[in-house]
């Protein structure tokens, strides 16, 4: 089983935003995250969650790292909320649509797109008192679960999703301490 991860690094390639963020960074806030690390996280999570998705030999997803300005535009367009957010996920697999039992082994099953605002992630990491990499891992896990059909429409489903995110972070060696129960 292989997962292809397409990374669009709009945020870190934008020098003005990087300069602003680097001025605020301390030595514990190490980024950017190298491609192989993102790929490792998603591959590991896919292996853990594979029994819950249509079987395929190859999977694919896209990850876009961006700023508050771009994610606000997307949030307004797709969720009708004209404000920045931390992560958006656009699932290709719809839960209510029947999926084939087995996908042709030559084809990649496209899971969808995850968009993360690094600016918002940085602020949340500061508020939570942990490194930026931990926050980005948390948001990536959250988006990944959405791609696989998880949702949090009520408190019970929210708690289940948070528990699963914590499990996924621990599986890749990232420790996450929740200091804000509303997360």
Swiss-Prot record:
Q: What class of enzyme is it?
A: hydrolase
Which residues does UniProt call coiled coil?
A: none
Localization per Swiss-Prot or TrEMBL: Cytoplasm
Name the predominant localization: cytoplasm
GO molecular function terms attached to this record:
metalloendopeptidase activity; RNA endonuclease activity; zinc ion binding
* Keywords associated with the record: Cytoplasm, Endonuclease, Hydrolase, Metal-binding, Nuclease, Ribosome biogenesis, rRNA processing, Zinc
For this chain's record, the cofactor binding note is:
Binds 1 zinc ion.
Which BP terms in the Gene Ontology apply to this protein?
rRNA processing
Which cofactor is essential here? Zn(2+)
Gene Ontology cellular-component terms for this entry are: cytoplasm
Per the entry, what this protein does is: Single strand-specific metallo-endoribonuclease involved in late-stage 70S ribosome quality control and in maturation of the 3' terminus of the 16S rRNA.
The record's listing under PANTHER family reads: ENDORIBONUCLEASE YBEY, CHLOROPLASTIC
Task: Give the NCBIfam families listed for this entry.
Answer: rRNA maturation RNase YbeY
Q: What is this protein called?
A: Endoribonuclease YbeY
> What organism is this sequence from?
Trichodesmium erythraeum (strain IMS101)
Question: Which gene name does the record give?
Answer: ybeY
């Amino acid at each position: 089983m292989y997962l292809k991860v397409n990374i669009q690094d709009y945020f870190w390639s934008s020098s003005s935003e990087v300069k602003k963020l680097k001025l605020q960074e301390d030595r514990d806030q190490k980024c950017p995250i190298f491609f192989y690390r993102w790929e490792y996280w998603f591959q590991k999570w896919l292996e853990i969650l594979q029994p819950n998705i249509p079987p395929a030999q190859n999977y694919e997803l896209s990850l876009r790292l961006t700023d508050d300005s771009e994610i606000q535009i997307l949030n307004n367009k797709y969720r009708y909320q004209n404000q920045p957010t931390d992560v958006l996920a656009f699932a290709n697999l719809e839960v209510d649509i029947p999926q084939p039992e087995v996908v042709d082994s030559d084809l990649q099953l496209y899971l969808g797109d995850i968009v993360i605002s690094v600016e918002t992630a940085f602020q949340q990491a500061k508020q939570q008192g942990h490194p930026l990499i931990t926050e980005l891992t948390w948001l990536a896990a959250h988006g990944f679960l959405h791609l696989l059909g998880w949702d949090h429409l009520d408190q019970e489903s929210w708690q289940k999703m948070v528990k699963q995110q914590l499990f996924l972070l621990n599986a890749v060696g990232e420790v996450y301490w929740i200091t804000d129960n509303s997360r």
